[in-house]
Amino acid sequence: MTTYNLSKKSEIWKEIPIEGFEKYMVSNFGNVKNINTDKILSQSNRGGYFSVYLKPKDIDAQQKKIHRLVALTFVKNKDPENKKVVNHINGDKLDNRAENLEWVTASENVQHAVDNNLITMTKRAVIQCNLKTGKKIKEFESVTDASNETGISTGHICDAANGKWKQAGGYAWKYSKKDSAKIDIDMSKFKQLVDFPNYLINNEGQVYSLARKRFMKPIHRGDSGMNISLSEGDKQKTMLVHKLVASYFLKKNNDDHNHVRHKDGNRQNNNVSNLEWCYLGGMDKHKPESHFSHDYYDEKTAIPLTERKKAVKTIKSSGSKTSKSIGSKTNKSAGSKTASKLGSKTAIKSGSKTTSKISTKSGSKTAIKSGSKTASKISTKSGSKTSKTSKSIKYYEV
């Protein structure tokens, strides 16, 4: 996580705009305090996000995520009906400065993570043990491998390995102590499901759940093919994997086509290269009583894959009016009208009478002045490792 030197003089405090929480204030830096005691409250890391316990009027204490409190108080939401998710612009979930937050839709939030490579896949070895003796039976490279060999669902194995359940499939399970292995997966090949934004699918038929942090295991339903159960809040739906793949990666050449056929006859081979749209008599896509006959095709998403451009990871100043990019000298001050970038890398703002340091690749040393009585230093090392402003979210493949 990047450390920022933030001046107290540029810290702005406002009351939290939630009914019943009037005695609390939050700052644009992500601090929370009690108005009556003027005491800044301690925060805890819960699931990768900083949160704080607040005691509203006549109600038990509630846990609130800091980034949502800051966004509700300082970040304008132009489309509150659709944009209900708070996104960290630089990818660092612990950086809760107001200028690093934005309101987005669930789809935009996932797409941001994919485009900026903030989803890192790893696989974690798991050990199958005798339920009575605890003796090791076999070690698998991943929960997926264990599930494929034993027939026990990945979810049940994970719950047992995490201690939620004592057993899964009649066996005890635990994770191996050896380091997790990183999987080289190109996330740019995945597309987000329109009606279920917490799921991604690629042209090989792999479906990844962002909520469960694992690949989903399809169920083989005989002649129907492989299907998968998706959920979003109270909404649940079972879909055929091959039709999902065709919907998102295979364009129809004829509007009369209403069926997806497996070229090799193997209904478990859902790679887009093995699928084709065709016409099947007797099927009426306007009759929704059978989800197996439902037409998932959406021409907006069924397009050839294009090379995604990675977004430039910059930190925008919420109070700035003008942005400039120059090659050598940079002016930058907290609350000023000018925000600047040095050589496409982001310069970190410093407050009045505050010294801040950042690391960047360059061949020389540059001293820059920012604001009134403020000095900023840039330490440079050619060919050395530089500090990153973004932090990867680590997901485990099971």
From Swiss-Prot:
<dbReference type="Pfam" id="PF07463">
    <property type="entry name" value="NUMOD4"/>
</dbReference>
<dbReference type="GO" id="GO:0004519">
    <property type="term" value="F:endonuclease activity"/>
</dbReference>
<feature type="region of interest" description="Disordered">
    <location>
        <begin position="313"/>
        <end position="398"/>
    </location>
</feature>
<keyword id="KW-0378">Hydrolase</keyword>
<keyword id="KW-0540">Nuclease</keyword>
<dbReference type="Pfam" id="PF13392">
    <property type="entry name" value="HNH_3"/>
</dbReference>
<dbReference type="InterPro" id="IPR003615">
    <property type="entry name" value="HNH_nuc"/>
</dbReference>
<feature type="compositionally biased region" description="Low complexity">
    <location>
        <begin position="343"/>
        <end position="398"/>
    </location>
</feature>
<dbReference type="InterPro" id="IPR010902">
    <property type="entry name" value="NUMOD4"/>
</dbReference>
<dbReference type="InterPro" id="IPR044925">
    <property type="entry name" value="His-Me_finger_sf"/>
</dbReference>
<feature type="compositionally biased region" description="Low complexity">
    <location>
        <begin position="314"/>
        <end position="333"/>
    </location>
</feature>
<keyword id="KW-0255">Endonuclease</keyword>
<dbReference type="InterPro" id="IPR036388">
    <property type="entry name" value="WH-like_DNA-bd_sf"/>
</dbReference>
<protein>
    <recommendedName>
        <fullName>Uncharacterized HNH endonuclease L247</fullName>
        <ecNumber>3.1.-.-</ecNumber>
    </recommendedName>
</protein>
<dbReference type="InterPro" id="IPR003647">
    <property type="entry name" value="Intron_nuc_1_rpt"/>
</dbReference>
